[in-house]
Amino acid sequence: MSSFVVPSLTAVRPRDHHDYADRIALSAATTDGVQMRTEDVRAWIAERRDANVFHVERIPFADLDQWWFEGVTGNLVHRSGRFFTIEGLHVIEHDGPHGDGPYREWQQPVIRQPEVGILGILAKEFDGVLHFLMQAKMEPGNPNLVQLSPTVQATRSNYTKAHGGTNVKLIEYFAPPDPERVIVDVLQAEQGSWFFRKSNRNMIVETVDDVPLWDDFCWLTLGQIAELMHEDETINMNSRSVLSCLPYQDITPRALFSDVQLLSWFTNERSRHDVRVRRIPLADVCGWKQGAEEIEHEDGRYFKVLAVAVKGSNREKISWTQPLVESVDLGVVAFLVRKIDGVPHVLVQARVDGGFLDTVELAPTVQCTPLNYAHLPAEERPPFLDLVQNAPRSRIRYEAIHSEEGGRFLGVRARYLVIDADEAIDPPPGYAWVTPAQLTALTRHGHYVNVEARTLLACINAAAAQPRGGA
């Protein structure tokens, strides 16, 4: 008879892992890094942009290389079958309109990208302070081309070199990671308005290695990154998403609702929405028209699909063509915030989007493109939109313009805000007051907090973090 060997057990970390939380808070409180001053980062980004050859040009769909409109479906696909496709989506909401649109039923083009990409940031301690390795990365859709991205930002097609390009630098730290060095590892969804069930693996991995420092990389503290988040179009969407998942310590462990109550409310929101979603051929999408250079809504609202030719001398592949999605106008993304019994709370909405895996995710108080509602009476516009747009400067606690993921979106930008709320606000159905700490806890699990809320959460957490016993 063979003997059974009992495996050794490992200690289970509590939800608030104080070692990491204290080190993260110290990094957030440190605004002097070992490599460069925060005020020099923008000049360094500009220098990296000037040191390389970057060019993005809009082209007709007919000039796309390796992309074509499939004969039967009309879907816009890559000949390799990899990367992503532009398809159609048919959404029916049986319980009322939600998301970024006033209608109970609609059809639209959508980006379908089944591959799970890696968004990985490498962390290392210098002089007792955690620093994070950021990359000055060119993306064709960035309004200013180069922004600070994660150490690794790559689809499976990229890091397996389906494009025939060079290796993705430092991918070995993330695929697979050393389990003893993982700080963050969670699948998070991307924009449910434009993607169909798209997720990326958000990761932060610590190292003690001597990591090569290429010209397009720099080590920054969390405090430096927090300062840069106050500047327009500097920290890219993927970096913001990953950093929002950091396990900050809850320094005010009280809230209007307990964690169990919050999860019960959220589960009820997911359960009560009856949303039917199915993929359809792009050629069958109603209400949209396709021309030689654009696919657009017949009323000029929402977004467009177009094509670009790209050159990027420091990319794994130095030239290529691809489709991109372009929004029709500047978006608005805002949290209303108030103190309840001295504890800051933000007003979240349980938002329905056709592209979400689980129908509903927690979103900012307001998340929309106002132009899409300009033709509607006030009562049909999103709740709190007018309040946010007309907020006096004295109530605005945070404001910056951030662009969305430049690998799929062309110049898509939103005005991100945190605004002091009127104490008398009573949340309507589908809205709830929660603490930033409760949202942070939920980012440890996928498909709870949407990507727009994660951006604002990253800004709020970095500004508020303090080491235990700190000032």
From Swiss-Prot:
Q: What is its EC number?
A: 4.2.1.159
> What is the enzyme's main class?
lyase
According to its UniProt entry, one GO biological process term is: antibiotic biosynthetic process
Catalytic activities: dTDP-4-dehydro-6-deoxy-alpha-D-glucose = dTDP-3,4-didehydro-2,6-dideoxy-alpha-D-glucose + H2O
Q: What is the effect of changing residue 452 to A?
A: Loss of dehydratase activity
Q: Name one GO molecular function term.
A: lyase activity
Its assembly, as annotated, is: Homodimer.
UniProt miscellaneous comment: Two binding sites (pockets A and B) for the dTDP-sugar ligands have been identified in each subunit. It seems that pocket A represents the active site and pocket B is a vestige of the gene duplication event.
What is this protein identified as? dTDP-4-dehydro-6-deoxy-alpha-D-glucopyranose 2,3-dehydratase
